[in-house]
Amino acid sequence: MRIFAKKSLGQHFLNSKHVLEQIISAGNIKSGENILEIGPGTGVLTEALLKTGAKVVAVEKDIRAFELLKEKFANEINSRQLKLVLGDILEENLLTSNFQLPTPYALIANIPYYITGAILEKFLEHEPRPNRMVLLVQKEVADRIVARPLQATGKSKESILSISVKVFGTPHFIAKVPPGAFTPPPTVDSAVLSIENISNTGFKSILAKNPDGISYFFKIVRAGFAHKRKLLKRNLEIVVKKETLDEVWKNMGLNEKIRAEDFTPNDWLNLVTHLI
């Protein structure tokens, strides 16, 4: 049985053994460990994950791929090393899901690029979080997440995307992946991205003050980046009273002319702790 990639599902099937090895190496997988794979497609990555001795839960939206995988991995399914689920991961409530995601777990996947943001939000901002991720994403997205220092200044420029990841874990750019590593090849370069040590411990002080502190945090961050040319403080006046900001800026000793892109993840956490 053979299936062809569906453009509507953003499918690009991995065909590179070298990239596969890079993903498995970055995953640092232990035998018996729980792995969640999203969009297994033809099962190339699934097979490599199973060879490590890991227990894999693979969630596939495409019924054609699901049937192919069910046949291809019949033995692993029977031995319960692989649990194959037909469904849309973005619609699954991981806490009450019928496939009962075992924890702790790692998320390792070649995801459709158009849902990268939604995947990061779902698995970083909500329980149960993976302890780490290894994802194939667009290179441009990986660059933005890691926000590596600019050659001219030696400083990195943060974005909503990079902050959204770094407050939960540590991202690493593992490797650039050319279009030819996929069938069909995408029109852009890709990258293997890992996010290590995922947790919400950075939000401890914020959550102690407000159980919905993570939502409030991102409300503040989004406001801070609302107008790129404006100063951070001016942007925040959209959602916080000027008098409150004046007091917080004074107490924290912040530069009046600082911009959102120059604020580090810890700066944001400290700011919201003072505001909440």
Predicted regions and their residues:
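Catalytic cores of RNA-modifying enzymes
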Residues: M1-K219, E243, E261, L271
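C-terminal lobe and adjacent flexible extensions of AdoMet/dcAdoMet transferase-like proteins
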Residues: N197, A223-I276
